[in-house]
Regions:
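Extracytoplasmic metal-acquisition and chelation regions
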Residues: 1-185
C-alpha cells in the first residue's frame, strides 16, 4: 500500500511481445543489431526481417479483425495475466485471478466469487489459462459457470511437444487468435 499522498506504482508486465505490434519493434531492433555486428550478412538479415515483419502485420490484422467483429471485449483468466500489452493493443478488458504474473498460487474466495459472477452475468463463454499452468482456478470457474477452458499462450514457455513439433511465436499467436475469437463471441 502506498502511503497517503504517494502514487501507486503501475503494474509491471514484462511480456511486451504479447502484442504483435511490440513484437515488430523487437524484431526490427534485433535485425538492426545483427546488421551492425555482421555487415556481410546484412542483406540476408534485412530480407528475413522484412518477411517476418509482414507475417507480424498479418497477425496484427487477424487480432484486430477478431476484436472488431466481436460480441464482447472482456477476457477472463482463471490464472495469472501476462497479456497487458495484448489487451491494451486491441482495447480489451480483462479480469484475472492474479495480477500480472504474480507468484501467488491461491486466489482468495472473494476473487473466485467475483470471477464466477462476472462470467455468469456477462455470459462469457471462455475462461483462459496460460501455458504450463495447473488450470485449477480456470477449472473451478468453468465448473461453476459452464464456460469452456482454453489456453491463451504467453509465448514465454513452450511444452516439449510444441518444441518437438517446431512451433514458434507465429504458430502460438495464431492459436491465440482462434482462442480469442471463441472467447469474444
Amino acid at each position: 500500500e502506498p502511503a497517503p499522498g504517494e502514487a501507486e506504482e503501475p503494474e509491471y508486465d514484462e511480456h511486451v511481445w504479447t502484442s504483435p505490434r511490440n513484437a515488430k519493434l523487437i524484431v526490427q531492433k534485433i535485425s538492426d543489431t545483427l546488421c551492425e555486428a555482421d555487415a556481410p550478412g546484412a542483406d540476408a538479415y534485412k530480407a528475413n526481417t522484412a518477411a517476418y515483419l509482414a507475417q507480424l502485420d498479418q497477425l496484427d490484422a487477424e487480432f484486430k479483425a477478431v476484436v472488431d467483429g466481436a460480441a464482447r471485449r472482456t477476457m477472463v483468466f482463471g490464472d495469472r495475466f501476462p497479456f497487458r500489452y495484448l489487451a491494451d493493443a486491441y482495447g480489451l478488458d480483462y479480469f484475472a485471478a492474479f495480477p500480472g504474473c504474480s507468484t501467488e498460487t491461491e486466489a482468495s474466495a472473494a476473487t473466485v466469487k467475483f470471477l464466477i459472477d462476472k462470467v455468469s452475468a456477462e455470459h462469457i463463454p471462455v475462461v483462459f489459462h496460460i501455458e504450463l499452468s495447473n488450470e485449477k482456478m480456470a477449472d473451478t470457474i468453468s465448473e461453476a459457470t459452464g464456460a469452456k477452458v482454453l489456453l491463451l499462450h504467453a509465448c514465454h514457455n513452450i511444452s516439449r511437444d510444441d518444441f518437438l513439433a517446431g512451433k514458434g511465436y507465429l504458430d502460438l499467436m495464431t492459436d491465440n487468435v482462434e482462442a480469442l475469437r471463441e472467447a469474444l463471441n
